[in-house]
Amino acid sequence: AVVTYTTPVGTDNCPGAVTVQTTGLPSGATFPVGTTTNTFKVTDAMGNSTTCSFTVTVNDTQFPVISCPANIVKSNDAGVCGAIVTFTAPVGTDNCPGAVTIRTTGLASGSTFPIGVTTNTYQVTDASGNVTTCSFTITVNDTEFPVITCPANIVKSNDVGLCSALVTYTAPVGTDNCPGSVTVQTAGLPSSSYFSVGVTTNTF
């Protein structure tokens, strides 16, 4: 910050005293963040000297700046319950050197993000402890349909003396790229049931 002050001038009982600044910066100079000690020395014609000092403290009250990418929406990678997502990680800037940017939530660029919404938050802290954050979301949608394969059609003669036949088969079980899929029979009869003469359609 630019700081102005009245420059001290020493006096003496005899003429010829000279005042000089021995440390610090002159009035009107740009003082750095922190504390600067200004020292002035007055010396008389006989070599006697006296000094005085004062401090100029400049506080960094300006917050750092950080900008996150736009929210990202992506479909899952084939056969995977998630998706690899890449983005440019934000890096904060500040009026003073020494700002540090870290990720406080979420996953790094190039990671496999799970199905659903992940919030990535980044925080930049400057050398004076001022903090600014930004966040964005990565949404991965599961757009892959589950897979199920039924047995081949079955043809069988009726059991002796019955208008039906006992039929067994391996019930199909679906698979999916994500856990939690459930297979149910929505039409027909379960394996080891007596199927009536005619055509019964089993749907899973």
Model-derived features: positions:
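Proline-threonine-serine-rich low-complexity tracts
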Residues: 1-203
